[in-house]
Amino acid sequence: FGERPYWWVHETKFYGAGPAPSLQQFPITCETGPGSPSGHAMGAAGVWYVMVTALLSIAREKQCPPLLYRFLYIGLWMLMGLVELVVCISRVYMAAHFPHQVIAGIITGTLVAEVVSKEKWIYSASLKKYFLITLFLTSFAVGFYVLLKALDVDLLWTMEKAQKWCIRPEWVHLDSAPFASLLRNMGSLFGLGLGLHSPFYKTTKMRIMSAPLRIGCIVISVSLLHLLDGWTFSPENHMTFYALSFGKSAVALLIPTTLVPWALSKIYPVKTEGKNL
C-alpha cells in the first residue's frame, strides 16, 4: 500500500528466482514517507481543481456567451488533465510511485478540494480556533504515534527502507518524512490563521485592488515562495529541523495572504471606501 518502487523491487518475491528490474534513481527519488497516495498528484489535483472551478464560476457570473463558455470549460479541464498527466508520469518515471498511487492522489486531491472549497468557516474562524485546531491535530498525531510505538508498530518503517535502498545516502531527505509533512501542514494551517487575522490583511481587504495590482501580487508572491522553497535546513538536529519546517510553512502562507498585498497597496495608491488614498 505505502511501498515505493525504488525499494519494493529489491524486497518483493514477485519476480521469484529471476532478476529484479533495474530502476534508475534520481536526486528526488528517495522520498522517505509512504507512497500512497501520491502527495504531488494530490496537491496538483487540489490546486488545479480550485483554480478551474473558480475561473468557470467567474465566467458564469460575467454571463459569458454559451459557446465561449463551452470552449473555456473544455479547455480548462483539458489543461488540468494535461498537467496531472505530466505530474503522474514524472512521479512513476522516477520510481517514487506506482500508477495506482498517483491515481489515488488525483482522486483524493479532487475530493478534498471539493469539500474544503464549500467550507466558508475558514475565513471567519478566530485566530484562537486556528491555534487550537493546529495544536489538537499535532498532539493527536504525535500521541497516536507514541501509542502505536508502545504496541511495537513502527510508523517510520519507510525511513529504514529509504536509507537501505537509496543508491546515494545524500539523496535521502528528512523533509519527506511523515513528521516533516505533518509539521509542514500544521504550519500552513497556522500561517493561514495568522494571515487572515493580521491587521495588514484587514487593511488590504478594505481596499479595491486593480487587476494589474492583483497580477503583481501573484507574480511577486510566486517568486518569493520559490526563493523560500530553496531555503533548506540541516537535518542533524531533528527538533530544530521540524521547528524550522513549521515556521517556514507558516511564512509561506503569510506571504501571499498578507505581506505582499499589504506592501504593494502601500507602494501604489488604491481606492478604499470610495476614496483615493
From Swiss-Prot:
<keyword id="KW-0256">Endoplasmic reticulum</keyword>
<feature type="short sequence motif" description="Prevents secretion from ER">
    <location>
        <begin position="274"/>
        <end position="277"/>
    </location>
</feature>
<dbReference type="GO" id="GO:0005789">
    <property type="term" value="C:endoplasmic reticulum membrane"/>
</dbReference>
<dbReference type="InterPro" id="IPR036938">
    <property type="entry name" value="P_Acid_Pase_2/haloperoxi_sf"/>
</dbReference>
<feature type="binding site">
    <location>
        <position position="91"/>
    </location>
    <ligand>
        <name>substrate</name>
    </ligand>
</feature>
<keyword id="KW-1133">Transmembrane helix</keyword>
<feature type="transmembrane region" description="Helical">
    <location>
        <begin position="67"/>
        <end position="87"/>
    </location>
</feature>
<dbReference type="GO" id="GO:0004346">
    <property type="term" value="F:glucose-6-phosphatase activity"/>
</dbReference>
<comment type="function">
    <text>Hydrolyzes glucose-6-phosphate to glucose in the endoplasmic reticulum. Forms with the glucose-6-phosphate transporter (SLC37A4/G6PT) the complex responsible for glucose production in the terminal step of glycogenolysis and gluconeogenesis. Hence, it is the key enzyme in homeostatic regulation of blood glucose levels.</text>
</comment>
<protein>
    <recommendedName>
        <fullName>Glucose-6-phosphatase catalytic subunit 1</fullName>
        <ecNumber>3.1.3.9</ecNumber>
    </recommendedName>
</protein>
<feature type="active site" description="Nucleophile">
    <location>
        <position position="97"/>
    </location>
</feature>
<dbReference type="InterPro" id="IPR000326">
    <property type="entry name" value="P_Acid_Pase_2/haloperoxidase"/>
</dbReference>
<feature type="active site" description="Proton donor">
    <location>
        <position position="40"/>
    </location>
</feature>
<dbReference type="GO" id="GO:0051156">
    <property type="term" value="P:glucose 6-phosphate metabolic process"/>
</dbReference>
<dbReference type="Pfam" id="PF01569">
    <property type="entry name" value="PAP2"/>
</dbReference>
<dbReference type="GO" id="GO:0006094">
    <property type="term" value="P:gluconeogenesis"/>
</dbReference>
<feature type="transmembrane region" description="Helical">
    <location>
        <begin position="215"/>
        <end position="235"/>
    </location>
</feature>
<comment type="pathway">
    <text>Carbohydrate biosynthesis; gluconeogenesis.</text>
</comment>
<feature type="transmembrane region" description="Helical">
    <location>
        <begin position="39"/>
        <end position="59"/>
    </location>
</feature>
<feature type="transmembrane region" description="Helical">
    <location>
        <begin position="250"/>
        <end position="270"/>
    </location>
</feature>
<feature type="transmembrane region" description="Helical">
    <location>
        <begin position="131"/>
        <end position="151"/>
    </location>
</feature>
<keyword id="KW-0378">Hydrolase</keyword>
<keyword id="KW-0812">Transmembrane</keyword>
<keyword id="KW-0312">Gluconeogenesis</keyword>
<keyword id="KW-0472">Membrane</keyword>
<comment type="similarity">
    <text>Belongs to the glucose-6-phosphatase family.</text>
</comment>
<feature type="binding site">
    <location>
        <position position="4"/>
    </location>
    <ligand>
        <name>substrate</name>
    </ligand>
</feature>
